[in-house]
């Protein structure tokens, strides 16, 4: 990358900052949830919606981001994404009620949904093909640092300032990024086909109302009749999309994708698997603070080993899959993650706090192996003409399943606990114990899906991918 022009390197820095902002925000909020609840006068059991509102908005908006970038231009959309994300951060900091905070987080989600995919598209357009991998490695590195810094930084700001600062720190970075985008980023456009607005709206309605219905009366206060109505609307919307996409070459996501067995199994496993995994980043800091009495900063520091384990495992995951095959790796890591979740709960409740960093490091390793294996399994056998559509659908499913996972975790806390749990409550640890046991069971369920993956122990993943790209 050293032979790239200075202007191109500056543009890559802009994209990298966007990746950093988006990835930092996915983890920095988790540590602050108990403090937010106290400040806003809410039960900690309701605060999962702060995460859900952001992640669900990202899932809904992702399918439109690439088309908008091609139609309006990458500079215009990337600038808009940064501005919306920054404004959302400002409104989050100014929020005085939970509902105001949820609306502001949704605005952040609109910006976050466009920032990363449009950033990837920008790199593709400004960097020669032979240097694309090196450029993507450069711009995604800050995105890996964000989750590492997020929990500890969030805890530090909450403990020594206030939760508002986890959003306020985005504002100067966002302003600099927006100005730099206007000054340095070229506005590439491409000829686009007509956007599938009908399909987009049907999917958006289906995902949003079903997630809202899942939150149930505990979180939303809706009556059983209203929840049943939401479920009916969501199911009808998704069925209508399936009918709409049948034999429709302009559909948002072609149903031809599901003719590839590994894609179908991988997508189903990714959806179910990330529901379980999505609970962990939300539940762990909440449990450490409310269940065990850790300070926000201490709870944030405890999350760092999990991120380090995840980053370290990425270097050898291809060799692991090549040696043992997708089916064995995915079944083993799914059951292993369930056992590690139980181990974390047991060591924490026994008071063996010195063991927790090692358990969380192991959790990060297992989770990272499973994530990487699920992603490559889902996409590896798709024909070239469906690869882009399949990748977009996988990205949307990843965000949707994470929002559902956090929603279920909040629902479990509400089912087992009272409306107001606290460190002083004698029943609090019992509430968390039942919640962790339920989570471990949910995490183990996708093993039944992965057991149906063809036995490909001797299929070399790296060679297979090189052959596909060469064709």
From Swiss-Prot:
Principal subcellular localization: membrane
Entry-linked InterPro entries: EmrB-like, MFS, MFS_dom, MFS_trans_sf, Multi-R_MdtD
Segment forming the signal sequence: none
Name of this protein: Putative multidrug resistance protein MdtD
Topological domain ranges for the Cytoplasmic compartment: 33-48, 98-101, 159-164, 218-224, 284-285, 363-395, 452-471
HAMAP family in the record: MFS_MdtD
Compartments (UniProt record): Cell inner membrane
Keywords: Cell inner membrane, Cell membrane, Membrane, Transmembrane, Transmembrane helix, Transport
A Pfam family it matches: MFS_1
Membrane topology, from the record: Multi-pass membrane protein
Organism of derivation: Escherichia coli O6:K15:H31 (strain 536 / UPEC)
Periplasmic side of membrane: 1-11, 70-76, 125-137, 186-196, 246-262, 307-341, 417-430
Family per similarity comment: Belongs to the major facilitator superfamily. TCR/Tet family.
GO CC term, one of those recorded: plasma membrane
GO molecular function: transmembrane transporter activity
Membrane-crossing segments per the record: 12-32, 49-69, 77-97, 102-124, 138-158, 165-185, 197-217, 225-245, 263-283, 286-306, 342-362, 396-416, 431-451
């Amino acid at each position: 990358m050293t032979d790239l022009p200075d202007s191109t390197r500056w543009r890559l820095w802009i994209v990298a900052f966007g990746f950093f902002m988006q990835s930092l925000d996915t983890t920095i909020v988790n540590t602050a949830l108990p403090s937010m609840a106290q400040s806003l006068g809410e039960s900690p059991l309701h605060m999962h919606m702060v995460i859900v509102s952001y992640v669900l908005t990202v899932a809904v908006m992702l399918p439109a981001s690439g088309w908008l970038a091609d139609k309006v231009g990458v500079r215009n959309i990337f600038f808009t994404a940064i501005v919306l994300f920054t404004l959302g951060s400002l409104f989050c900091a100014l929020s005085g009620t939970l509902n105001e905070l949820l609306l502001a987080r949704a605005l952040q989600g609109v910006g976050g949904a466009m920032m990363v995919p449009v950033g990837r598209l920008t790199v593709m357009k400004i960097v020669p093909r032979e240097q694309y991998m090196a450029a993507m490695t450069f711009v995604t590195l800050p995105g890996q640092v964000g989750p590492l810094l997020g929990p500890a930084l969030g805890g530090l700001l909450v403990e020594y300032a206030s939760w508002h600062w986890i959003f306020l720190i985005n504002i100067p970075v966002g302003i600099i990024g927006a100005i730099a985008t206007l000054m340095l980023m070229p506005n590439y456009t491409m000829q686009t086909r007509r956007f599938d607005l009908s399909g987009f709206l049907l999917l958006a309605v289906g995902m949003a109302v079903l997630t809202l219905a899942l939150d149930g009366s505990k979180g939303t206060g809706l009556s059983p009749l209203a929840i049943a109505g939401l479920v009916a609307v969501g199911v009808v919307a998704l069925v209508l999309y399936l009918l709409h996409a049948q034999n429709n070459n302009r559909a948002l996501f072609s149903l031809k994708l599901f003719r590839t067995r590994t894609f179908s199994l991988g997508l189903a496993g990714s959806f179910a698997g990330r529901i379980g995994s999505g609970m962990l980043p939300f539940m762990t800091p909440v449990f450490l603070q409310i269940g065990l009495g850790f300070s926000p900063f201490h709870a944030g520091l405890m999350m760092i080993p999990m991120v380090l384990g995840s980053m370290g495992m990425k270097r050898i995951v291809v060799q692991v899959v090549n040696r043992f095959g997708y089916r064995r790796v995915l079944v083993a890591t799914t059951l292993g993650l369930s056992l590690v979740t139980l181990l974390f709960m047991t060591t924490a409740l026994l008071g063996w706090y010195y063991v927790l960093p090692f358990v969380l490091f192991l959790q990060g390793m297992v989770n990272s192996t499973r994530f990487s294996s699920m992603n490559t399994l889902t996409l590896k056998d798709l024909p070239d003409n469906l690869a882009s559509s399949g990748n977009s659908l996988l990205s949307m499913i990843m965000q949707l399943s994470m929002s559902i996972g956090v929603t279920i975790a909040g629902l479990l806390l509400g089912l087992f606990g009272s409306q107001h749990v606290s460190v002083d409550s004698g029943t609090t640890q019992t509430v968390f114990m039942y919640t962790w046991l339920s989570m471990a069971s949910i995490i183990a369920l996708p093993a039944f899906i992965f057991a149906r993956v063809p036995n490909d122990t001797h299929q070399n993943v790296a060679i297979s991918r090189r052959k596909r790209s060469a064709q």
